[in-house]
Amino acid sequence: DLSVDVKPGMRVAIVGPTGCGKTTLINLLMRFYDVQDGQITIDGTPVQQIGRKALRKNFGMVLQDTWLKCGSILENIRMGNPGASYDEVVAAAKKAHAHSFIQRLPEGYYTKIGEDGGSLSQGQKQLLCIARIMLCDPSVLILDEATSSIDTTTEMRIQQAFLTLMEGRTSFIVAHRLSTIKGADLILVMKNGTIIEQGTHASLLSDKGFYYHLYNSQFPETDQLA
């Protein structure tokens, strides 16, 4: 039972325990499968009336499970925009904080990798996918556990890069680390497939409901209203 109104340009965070329905909500938005009851609309048009290909062209996704293809680093990033120049690819990689590790690879941007990413770490593979999204410049972002396998220092840098990327774009962030979504315009708190709370970080803490206890479990020694 969901009822949410997301305005253009809003940053929306989706949080809750494992299995609460966060990923299902994203799958419905992307039309990986369709809603059985009710409807999801974009600018007043039900998503079922928008072709899947046309719908997904507007979305940029960074998932916990990365997807790469056999080919060079350059080709993998350029999937976000096949017509992009070398300089544009490098610029996107710099924004994603991937440029420095790419430069250290044997052949830099021309280093070949397999679908499993070869010797790249999970964090490095995610950085490549983030660079790809930087390059395709979508109108809507979906970040599903995007920084879950990246070290804390890199995560901070990526968060800053995404703050720039999210400006003027509607963004949906699915995360377990509540510290990364405190600045969201709207936080949807899910449990058992239902949105049980919604509001800003400050308002949800002041309500002292489920979100308050979820946040407190991660930061027990933090001033909750800070």
Regions found by a protein language model. Give the residues of each.
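ABC-type nucleotide-binding domain
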Residues: 1-226
